[in-house]
Amino acid sequence: MNEIMDMDEKKPVFGNHSEDIQTKLDKKLGPEYISKRVGFGTSRIAYIEGWRVINLANQIFGYNGWSTEVKSVVIDFLDERQGKFSIGCTAIVRVTLTSGTYREDIGYGTVENERRKPAAFERAKKSAVTDALKRSLRGFGNALGNCLYDKDFLAKIDKVKFDPPDFDENNLFRPTDEISESSRTNTLHENQEQQQYPNKRRQLTKVTNTNPDSTKNLVKIENTVSRGTPMMAAPAEANSKNSSNKDTDLKSLDASKQDQDDLLDDSLMFSDDFQDDDLINMGNTNSNVLTTEKDPVVAKQSPTASSNPEAEQITFVTAKAATSVQNERYIGEESIFDPKYQAQSIRHTVDQTTSKHIPASVLKDKTMTTARDSVYEKFAPKGKQLSMKNNDKELGPHMLEGAGNQVPRETTPIKTNATAFPPAAAPRFAPPSKVVHPNGNGAVPAVPQQRSTRREVGRPKINPLHARKPT
């Protein structure tokens, strides 16, 4: 037998399939595999894409029948102009079959006017390696791209018509695909090893009553519902004299232990951990504990409870995971946790399950207006001033309105002495006018402007008396 096994190991990988591989390599590519790009001038260059040639190599040689090796990558030039990078890169790739046959060739990749330097290097090196891979694979035969250098073949292949491949939804690799039996057994074996060493931080054991004469089985009730309905986190295990029943209960507990660890909420297990003193008080007091004699549901679950019950495992789970916990164990209708429960005493006017704008009809029913006229009334339009009003009444001629938090003050009227000067002695320049901001808080008394008879621009020209001509 050993001699036969040694002969099988020394046997070529391809064996009788080498002729089939050679037959496939001699065939030329169909129009489905050929792509074209614009070359120099108006010419069009035929080529095969990198992902297509990799798929062909896997189909011909097998997924484990060939391998690639990047021998070298060299940067030929790197130019920077106005913050843009241009890179030229050369790569050498070797393709080796399992039989030892290999092909090696060179590839080139360029990137022009790339703003980001890392992206320029990435594109240049990848394109160079892909080009070298395609040139190396074409050395094995026509089916891997060597036929694209035959001009007569390219002239005839353009006339061949073909239908594009249809999209097959059943040929997609989905997460629901079956896994091999070997991987399943390995996974189950690892899970069993993990279950033997549970997480100590996530386990919380309640101390039971130490009285040996007591025959009551204590069950911890966790109140996690807003309406006050208790929910049982984990039922107590019955300690039976029958070894077969005990083994069955232990197996079921180990099977669900991993699921409970996944459903735990880490945010509930840090500051809310129970101390040893609290655990002892919980076991001695009857405030948060129910007995199996009073609860028929618990009595139904543990009919063979003995005088020395085992320590019960108490865990905290999120409200989202409460449904899965309830499905695994029997829980009475009164203790079922309902995550969609809404108290009847609270009136829900807005649908909490959706996110949308509040309709205008709801605001109208609540006498809420969406108009903003009252806000805009506090600001004056552009180029205008707010009217001097206080409580919708005009102020007197001797009252001026101040800021919003100031009391109107009384001012004395300003007397103008326009009649004190004769028309000839009137000022030659226009009186200065004080600019008032439209939204200013302070009020400025309105000074009547005296209209001048003549307005001069620049320096006035006044002749002296002796230079005047006699009239």
Curated annotation (Swiss-Prot):
Pfam families according to UniProt: Rad52_Rad22
Molecular function via GO: DNA strand exchange activity; DNA/DNA annealing activity
Residue segments, region Disordered: 166-251, 417-471
InterPro entries: DNA_recomb/repair_Rad52, Rad52_fam, Rad52_Rad59_Rad22, Rad52_Rad59_Rad22_sf
A GO cellular component entry from the record: nucleus
Composition bias type Polar residues, residue spans: 182-198, 205-227
Note from the entry: Present with 1080 molecules/cell in log phase SD medium.
Function, in words: Involved in DNA double-strand break (DSB) repair and recombination. Promotes the annealing of complementary single-stranded DNA and by stimulation of the RAD51 recombinase.
Quaternary organization: Part of a complex that includes RAD51, RAD52 and RAD59. Interacts with SAW1.
The protein's name: DNA repair and recombination protein RAD52
Species of origin: Saccharomyces cerevisiae (strain ATCC 204508 / S288c) (Baker's yeast)
Classification lineage: Eukaryota, Fungi, Dikarya, Ascomycota, Saccharomycotina
Gene, per the UniProt record: RAD52
